[in-house]
């Protein structure tokens, strides 16, 4: 019997971790993962449904798999909208929502029974990873308790469910033992970790720790590898983490989505609504940890956004001088409460504001990177091509930030650290030579 499974993982790093867990279970039960539809006995597609373009990509992928294979199991965020999938592809075998690991595996069992003698001893202790060996995503919770009006993640992934502290730390320890040099801490709301457990106390390696964001960062920092924080909602207690960055326990890098700067827009988004307070906090973080890299994301073209309110956002950008910034044009995701707001912004204006926003940020980034010329940086080697080495500094998360380019030199290996001197820069990347 064909025990081959095709697997497609779409969407964000949180979905990638879900895919890793499903694949680990399937491999442990003897299934073989294959890269093509035609060789597979069944195809599993982990979908994204966050914005309309992601929904369309997911539906297109399902249709392609149905056309080339015909035996498709669908899971992930879009699975929360089973009717959308059924309308587009009525013959899919099974549909489940996000983080439904057991349901997906059971569906595979139903339509493609596992082999009688699985080779579980071939599965590494840290499980199957879809990232390069030297870095891994560490998901610490599921779901979100926020009620942001532009977002439907709580509908798709449910309320906050923090993973047990010991489970997270055990996984982190296994990843380090497997050679991982960088952990990227992720969730829908990373800084809310432990809220749902009321910060319960647990025992870990002979000591008592609280199930809360600070304690988790402190314990991860003791591993002695890079620990990078993503999706950090700007709660007041985030300020307590910055000294850990200053002291070298975790990377001086904070991914903190701010979304806008105008108070009326922020209130309409149901986000923290004081840009003045945010600027004061940014100044405080930089005073405590001068090397901190601040990454954020913003939305332009939110319903009702006026030219004056957009200009306020640009002024905030110029004053905040953030290091890394992403920008999204507002997308009217089905089910989002913001869709009911008056005065939607036209697509032309969204596009024009997006380009103006990115122009401002490109200049900020260009000047910040130029100031790094002549400095010495520690970099992690990501890739070696025929003619160059591609690395990342402490300021650069994989996939979303800039890169550090080095001339190719023998003796350097992927996944190793190196000390480099920055020799040049452009809008988003650095160029360097070995010390």
UniProtKB/Swiss-Prot annotation:
CDD domains, per database record: Radical_SAM
Q: What is the official name of this protein in its record?
A: Ribosomal protein uS12 methylthiotransferase RimO
| Superkingdom as given in the UniProt entry | Bacteria
Organism, by scientific name, is Legionella pneumophila (strain Lens)
Annotated residues for binding of [4Fe-4S] cluster 1: 12, 48, 77
- Which cofactors? [4Fe-4S] cluster
Which reaction does this enzyme catalyse, per its entry?
Answer: L-aspartate(89)-[ribosomal protein uS12]-hydrogen + (sulfur carrier)-SH + AH2 + 2 S-adenosyl-L-methionine = 3-methylsulfanyl-L-aspartate(89)-[ribosomal protein uS12]-hydrogen + (sulfur carrier)-H + 5'-deoxyadenosine + L-methionine + A + S-adenosyl-L-homocysteine + 2 H(+)
The protein's gene is named rimO
Question: What class does this enzyme belong to in the EC scheme?
Answer: transferase
């Amino acid at each position: 019997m064909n025990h081959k499974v095709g697997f497609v993982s779409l969407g964000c790093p949180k979905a990638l971790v879900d895919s890793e867990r499903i694949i680990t279970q399937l491999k442990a039960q003897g299934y073989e993962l294959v890269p093509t539809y035609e060789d597979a006995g069944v195809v599993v597609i982990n979908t994204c449904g966050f914005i309309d373009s992601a929904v369309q990509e997911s539906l297109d992928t399902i249709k392609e798999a149905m056309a080339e294979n015909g035996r498709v199991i669908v899971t992930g965020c879009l699975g929360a909208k089973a009717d959308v999938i059924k309308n587009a592809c009525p013959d899919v075998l099974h549909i489940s929502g996000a983080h439904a690991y057991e349901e997906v595996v059971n569906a595979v069992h139903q339509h493609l029974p596992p082999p009688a003698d699985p080779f579980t001893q071939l599965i590494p202790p840290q499980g199957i990873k879809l990232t390069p060996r030297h870095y891994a995503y560490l998901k610490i919770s599921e779901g979100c308790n926020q009620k942001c009006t532009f977002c439907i993640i709580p509908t798709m992934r449910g309320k906050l469910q923090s993973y047990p502290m010991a489970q997270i730390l055990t996984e982190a320890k296994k990843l380090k033992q497997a050679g991982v040099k960088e952990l990227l801490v992720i969730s829908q709301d990373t800084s809310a970790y432990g809220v749902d457990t009321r910060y319960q106390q647990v025992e870990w390696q002979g000591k008592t720790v609280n199930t809360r964001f600070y304690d988790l960062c402190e314990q991860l920092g003791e591993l002695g590898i890079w620990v990078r924080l993503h999706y950090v909602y700007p709660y007041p207690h985030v300020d307590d983490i910055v000294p850990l960055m200053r002291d070298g326990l975790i990377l001086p890098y904070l991914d903190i989505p701010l979304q806008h700067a105008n108070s009326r827009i922020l209130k309409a988004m149901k986000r923290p609504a004081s840009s003045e307070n945010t600027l004061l906090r940014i100044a405080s973080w930089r005073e405590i940890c001068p090397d901190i890299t601040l990454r954020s994301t913003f939305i332009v073209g939110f319903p009702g956004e006026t030219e004056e309110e957009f200009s306020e956002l640009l002024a905030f950008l110029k004053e905040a001088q953030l290091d890394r910034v992403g920008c999204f044009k507002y997308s009217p995701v089905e089910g989002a409460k913001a869709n009911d707001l008056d005065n939607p912004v036209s697509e032309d204006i969204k596009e024009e504001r997006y380009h103006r926003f990115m122009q401002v940020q490109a200049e900020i980034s260009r000047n910040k990177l130029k100031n790094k010329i002549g400095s010495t940086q520690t970099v992690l080697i990501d890739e070696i091509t025929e003619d160059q080495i591609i690395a990342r500094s402490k300021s650069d998360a994989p996939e979303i930030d800039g890169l550090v380019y080095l001339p190719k030199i023998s003796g350097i290996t992927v996944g190793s650290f190196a000390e480099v001197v920055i020799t040049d820069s452009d809008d988003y990347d650095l160029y360097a030579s070995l010390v």
